[in-house]
């Protein structure tokens, strides 16, 4: 076919993006502004106790009705399907609050029902909170399945600041994985195996720059945490633009999946992919290898991983 033929595909990006302090209390206002008056609310374990008061006061103030509320402990597709099709009529949006499990559960629920999904991550451990895929189990096996990118993402930096250090370092590792992932993607394209999307690639690189070139390298600092949140958000959107996880996931993710299967005590996803990304960059003779080493040293990532090795 002619190289000049345009291939058009619909790309969805979040309409509602809020990153800042005290945002949990404002979710009611954001939903009201978008006319989402009835919601299904899914909590991660322990999250309702921690954040329920703040969130529900804001919902009450703006007349937002919780038509269904549940705490999620499973990511089995059978459970998600059952929950999705038992939601009451009148639900205008699905809201997920917590870590990866509940966000994937709520995201896939909204995808099945073609409802807007509002992602409210309580940690910055990876870019899944804004990706167009869900990590679920089907028949006991872990699967990454297509779903829809969130309609909205609300990140409360007060909540992120209270996270254990391991979550922040996991987020750093998931971001640094872009270096080896983008190299792999370009290599596959050069060998004729893949299509390449320059804009998605540029967006993924820019998300790295935003995090590591502009700000402090201390994961405990509020500026770093804001940048980490924004960078992971961009990474999720880059995957949506590319129509593939390639801008964010390469050989380092395959090593992490192998560790999940083989290691006696697998670590958090981002800690594994960050460590693997450095090894992959060396194998690739990636020109960014020195930068990866400097960042993982300066942020304290290497020291953190070394204190409790794989």
For the regions a language model picked out, list residue spans one by one.
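Short beta-strand/turn micro-motifs composed of small residues
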Residues: 42-43, 98, 155
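A glycine/threonine-rich phosphate-anchoring loop and its flanking beta-alpha core
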Residues: 112-207
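A short, small-residue-rich loop immediately preceding and capping a beta-strand
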Residues: 87-109, 113-123
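Short glycine/serine/threonine-rich phosphate/pyrophosphate-binding segments
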Residues: 49-51, 99-107, 126-129, 248, ...
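ATP/NTP phosphate-donor binding region
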Residues: 1-93
